[in-house]
């Protein structure tokens, strides 16, 4: 039965790939609801699946397809962003304090919690309510008492803002205000639907503990420059900090910030060494190539249209 469901699911997904060629999308009358119905009907995976040593929970009957799509990626590959995952496992140590910014449903939060063990700490920030609910459930499912989740966005100031909800992928919610439907470089569509969320700064949250953080993971869909501004004290005081950043220049620019200034600040003001994590990177046998100029990074992003994953280590004289 399991193999049959997987077969139907693959056939369904293959058929759906033909829709754009026929001029059909989620906005076509009734297409979105029909797609969601069959997506759930053919959903082949268990309620919980083990990924990278931790269990992730999902309830296909009561879960929006956009969250199921995130889980589908994990279930199919048993890994998310393989190269970054392998490096993350190499960098994070037992007893570390890890901060996960843009935690989604908890992939890197769970991985970090497993790596740091009971003597470590993980702080996960996720503002979107449905993502946050699964983040909390997944932490509890694994009895990771060392991990704590907070339904807040990180920014340059404490307050409230709008979070715009992506209509097909829970990893692309953003505080970028869209005009109508925004089409990003890979065909993303962001609806005008928004919710009010709370924002905090990391400097306020970790006041007095700036030097305790070992690793941060940042995936904040364009709010990187704002997040950086809100953790200035941490960056100036913490000599051991290591960072994983998903860098997408186009989204940073849409927030009114300069992607070039963002990289320059990391290189010159905070004296980080910046390394690009290639998709085919093997953490066990390869060394990362250091990137020394803004121009090199922008070239890899192909004129700001693509994102890349970066690893940063502190460089002190």
Per-region residue spans from a language model:
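Short internal loop-to-helix segment that lines adenine-nucleotide cofactor pockets
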Residues: 75-97, 144, 160-162, 177-238, ...
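Core alpha/beta nucleotide-donor-binding catalytic domains of modification enzymes
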Residues: 136-168
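S-adenosyl-L-methionine
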Residues: 1-138, 142-145, 187-191, 206-211, ...
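Short, conserved loop/helix-junction motifs that constitute active-site signature segments
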Residues: 112-117, 231-239, 266-269
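Active-site flanking residues adjacent to catalytic metal/cofactor-binding acidic residues
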Residues: 99, 125, 216-218, 245-246
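Conserved Class I S-adenosyl-L-methionine
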Residues: 259-273
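Conserved beta-strand signature within the Rossmann-like core of class I S-adenosyl-L-methionine
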Residues: 239-247
